[in-house]
């Protein structure tokens, strides 16, 4: 699997996780302990098929839950990136993912703003259509992959270096802009009295992703390498700061926690 596709999946999970924490700190989301060699399960298509359509009438938390039910756990995604990528140095991958983690407050604001904007259109039914599209996430995977591939090809043409790494580094803005683009597409489809709004969204999704990504990647500063960055350590630290040590402990193994404690003592 190409780095850019895995990177986008990771960015999607990071953003969704951040928004969940922001909207409902007490939200009891099941977390599996990440072992030394985690296995990433295939998304369960039946989950999306069985989601009650009444989710469209619930809060933003419901939308994000539908997303999280269809993507791997955040720890497994990051581990998969590290194991599956060829041609990218480990320290580069650590650095860029840690950069996204460090920008978590901005990710929360970006996703929160985009989804709140969508929710504000609920009175004309737009929010229901956006929600139903997200619930049917498995159908959206192929257009997303196409959009990512278009983005990569355009970035190559424009001479962007470290394309995959830059996609992740700029993920907060990209996620926000893509959600905004989908919202506008739904609104336009309703104005045009389109019979199948989801089909309209799927048709335009590759272009939406490519359009919002091209200018961002073309104008983004060169990727900065930091060989001293350790992804897992930063992730655990940020988790403790955000959701507390007990919840953070549920997301990682005891060995990882022990390593982090040892690191703190070494730095003291």
Curated annotation (Swiss-Prot):
Major localization listed first in the record, in broad terms: secreted
Entry keyword annotation includes Translocase: no
GO molecular function: toxin activity
Signal sequence extent: 1-18
Compartment(s) of residence: Secreted
GO biological process, one term: symbiont-mediated cytolysis of host cell
Highest taxon listed in the record's lineage: Eukaryota
Keyword Zinc tagged: no
CC annotations in GO: extracellular region; host cell plasma membrane; membrane
Keywords: Cleavage on pair of basic residues, Host cell membrane, Host membrane, Membrane, Secreted, Signal, Toxin
Induction summary: Expression is not markedly induced by human epithelial cells.
Domain notes: The N-terminal alpha-helix of peptide ECE1-III allows insertion of the toxin into host epithelial cells membranes.
Function, in words: Secreted protein cleaved by KEX2 in 8 similar peptides (ECE1-I to ECE1-VIII). Stimulates biofilm formation.
Protein's UniProt name: Extent of cell elongation protein 1
Source taxonomy: Eukaryota, Fungi, Dikarya, Ascomycota, Saccharomycotina
Gene behind this protein: ECE1
């Amino acid at each position: 699997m190409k780095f850019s596709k895995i990177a986008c999946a990771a960015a999607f999970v990071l953003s969704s996780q951040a928004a969940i924490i922001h909207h409902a700190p007490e939200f009891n989301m099941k977390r599996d302990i990440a072992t030394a060699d985690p296995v990433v399960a295939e998304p369960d298509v039946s989950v999306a098929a069985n989601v009650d359509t009444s989710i469209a009438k619930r809060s933003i938390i419901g939308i994000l839950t539908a997303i999280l039910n269809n993507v791997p756990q955040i720890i497994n995604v990051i581990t998969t990136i590290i194991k599956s990528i060829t041609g990218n140095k480990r320290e580069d991958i650590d650095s860029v993912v840690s950069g996204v983690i460090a920008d978590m407050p901005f990710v929360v604001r970006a996703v929160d703003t985009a989804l709140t904007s969508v929710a504000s259109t609920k009175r004309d039914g737009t929010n229901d259509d956006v929600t139903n599209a997200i619930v049917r996430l498995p159908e959206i995977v192929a257009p997303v992959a196409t959009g990512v591939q278009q983005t990569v090809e355009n970035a190559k043409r424009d001479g962007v270096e470290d394309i995959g790494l830059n996609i992740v580094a700029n993920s907060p803005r990209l996620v926000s802009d893509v959600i905004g683009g989908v919202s506008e597409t739904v609104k336009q489809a309703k104005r045009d009295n389109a019979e199948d709004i989801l089909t309209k969204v799927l048709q335009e999704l590759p272009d939406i992703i490519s359009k919002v990504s091209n200018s961002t990647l073309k104008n983004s500063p060169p990727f900065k390498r930091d060989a001293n960055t350790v992804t897992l350590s930063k992730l655990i630290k940020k988790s403790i700061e955000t959701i507390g040590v007990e919840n953070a402990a549920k997301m990682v193994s005891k060995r990882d926690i022990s390593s982090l404690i040892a690191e703190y003592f070494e730095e003291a």
